[in-house]
């Protein structure tokens, strides 16, 4: 029998996995972010309110995240490769089914349930597999993969507006169904990797496969609570930034430009944040607090911008606020997944990723419909963005208790080498980076 490697290769095929995760993220969250541009067309076609149509994107987000632990459990049992490939097929079928919808219920089932279930099977296994391939450059690799969100939004926002103008919402969804089928070959690139911290046998029970025992660890529980609160406002701009720009007096392509500006800032910030986190200059929990708070302030700023005088106006204040939001939200995203190996160990990172996505789904299910409800009551999205920013700022405040919850931040040091397959805190080298020269002392990035 071939012995297991001592640790992640920190490169090699890992960069191919990073490229696959990049595409998976772009075809999931990038597409979900751009779908908000189609909501006004759906509301007009079906003669329904903004709150009713917001449930289309909200259900897709909620199902994708709520079912992420199922994707993680299936990946733990059968491997990430087949799970992601099946998820790509389900996502494509959901979009194609939605193109022939005769009512909002059909869209709820097609985009919300079927496509959302497919997205649930692709994201957590892909990102969890990527985390297993890297150690010293883990957050940078995760940040690189998560730039797929911004890069995809940059391309899909104007492309989707063009498709809506040219083919209508039915033709646009049909073509997007063909595009998302590319998730299947991306899954084929996720080569399995055996590590020394892996359990000798797959979990025997469904509860063990879901990794619910991780909530017994105080650090993970604090992190999960803060992340769930942030999810209540984090995804509202994904769904309603485009419609908010339209309400502010900008035309269709002006609204697409606002989404694209946020996407560019998001993509650039994810790489920069990943590089910064891997340097070890600032502990990861403190970075979470800083960039989480800035994200909340960015959403607040978008809710306070004045309206544009004419439809031809470009809305410089909203563009600036969207850029600031994109930079802060993009900086926050890789830290959420980069900190997980330090909280639960490399053996539990796939399960923890799924659980975090499930918790964020609680906010993802609440935020967009609440935003649509407030828009129907007030006439615009200003109040919606103000309320959702309070969720993000509250979650960032919860993160401030994270260092105290980590065993390595208490006066008594933890054991030097706890078994990672039991979901315990990894030794410091697993969550830190060597000095800039590649050698020398290792800096603790946890506290």
Swiss-Prot record:
Q: Name one GO biological process term.
A: lipid metabolic process
List the lineage, top down. Eukaryota, Metazoa, Chordata, Craniata, Vertebrata
Q: How does it sit in the membrane?
A: Multi-pass membrane protein
Q: Where in the cell is it found?
A: Endoplasmic reticulum membrane; Cell membrane
Give ranges for the Cytoplasmic compartment.
Answer: 1-11, 404-447
Alphabetical list of InterPro entries matching this protein: MFS (IPR011701), MFS_dom (IPR020846), MFS_trans_sf (IPR036259), Proton-linked_MCT (IPR050327)
Report the gene name. Answer: Slc16a11
The record, for Pfam families, names: MFS_1
Q: How does it assemble?
A: Interacts with isoform 2 of BSG.
What are the UniProt keywords, alphabetically? Answer: Cell membrane, Endoplasmic reticulum, Lipid metabolism, Membrane, Symport, Transmembrane, Transmembrane helix, Transport
Catalysed reactions, semicolon-separated: pyruvate(out) + H(+)(out) = pyruvate(in) + H(+)(in)
Q: What name does the UniProt record give this protein? A: Monocarboxylate transporter 11
Identify a single GO molecular function assigned to this protein. Answer: symporter activity
- Give a GO cellular-component term: endoplasmic reticulum membrane
């Amino acid at each position: 029998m071939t012995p297991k490697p001592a640790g992640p290769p920190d490169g090699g095929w890992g960069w191919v996995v990073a490229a696959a995760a990049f595409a998976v993220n772009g075809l999931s969250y990038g597409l979900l972010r751009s779908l908000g541009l189609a909501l006004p067309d759906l509301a007009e076609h079906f003669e329904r309110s903004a709150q009713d149509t917001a449930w289309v994107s909200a259900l897709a987000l909620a199902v994708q995240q709520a079912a992420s632990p199922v994707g993680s459990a299936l990946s733990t049992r059968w491997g990430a490769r087949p799970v992601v490939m099946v998820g790509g097929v389900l996502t494509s079928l959901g979009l194609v089914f939605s193109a022939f919808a005769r009512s909002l219920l059909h869209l709820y089932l097609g985009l919300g349930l079927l496509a959302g279930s497919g997205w649930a099977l692709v994201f957590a296994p892909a990102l969890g597999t990527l985390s297993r391939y890297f150690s010293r450059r883990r957050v940078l690799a995760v940040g690189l993969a998560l730039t797929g969100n911004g890069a995809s939004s940059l391309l899909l926002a104007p492309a989707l507006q063009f498709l809506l103008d040219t083919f209508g919402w039915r033709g646009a969804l049909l073509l997007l169904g063909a595009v998302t089928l590319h998730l299947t070959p991306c899954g084929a690139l996720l080569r399995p990797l055996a590590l020394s911290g892996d359990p000798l046998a797959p979990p025997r029970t469904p509860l063990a496969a879901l990794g619910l025992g991780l909530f017994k660890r105080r650090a993970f529980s604090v992190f999960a609570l803060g992340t769930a609160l942030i999810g209540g406002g984090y995804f509202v701009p994904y769904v309603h930034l485009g419609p908010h720009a339209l309400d502010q007096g900008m035309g269709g392509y002006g609204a697409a430009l606002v989404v694209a500006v946020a996407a560019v800032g998001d993509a650039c910030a994810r790489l920069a944040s990943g590089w910064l986190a891997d340097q070890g200059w600032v502990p990861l929990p403190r970075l979470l607090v800083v960039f989480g708070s800035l994200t909340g302030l960015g959403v607040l700023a978008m809710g306070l911008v004045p309206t544009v005088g004419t439809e031809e106006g470009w809305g410089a204040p909203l563009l600036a606020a969207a850029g600031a939001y994109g930079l802060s939200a993009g900086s926050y995203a890789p830290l959420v997944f980069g900190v997980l190996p330090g909280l639960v160990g490399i053996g539990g990172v796939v399960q923890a990723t799924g659980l975090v996505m499930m918790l964020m789904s609680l906010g993802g299910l609440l935020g967009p419909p609440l935003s649509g409800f407030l828009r129907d009551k007030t006439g615009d999205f200003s109040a919606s963005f103000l309320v959702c920013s309070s969720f993000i700022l509250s979650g960032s405040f919860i993160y401030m208790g994270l260092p105290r919850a980590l065993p390595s931040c208490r006066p008594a040091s933890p054991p030097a080498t706890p078994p990672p397959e039991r979901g315990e805190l990894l030794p410091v080298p697993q969550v830190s980076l060597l000095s800039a020269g590649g050698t020398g002392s290792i800096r603790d990035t946890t506290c």
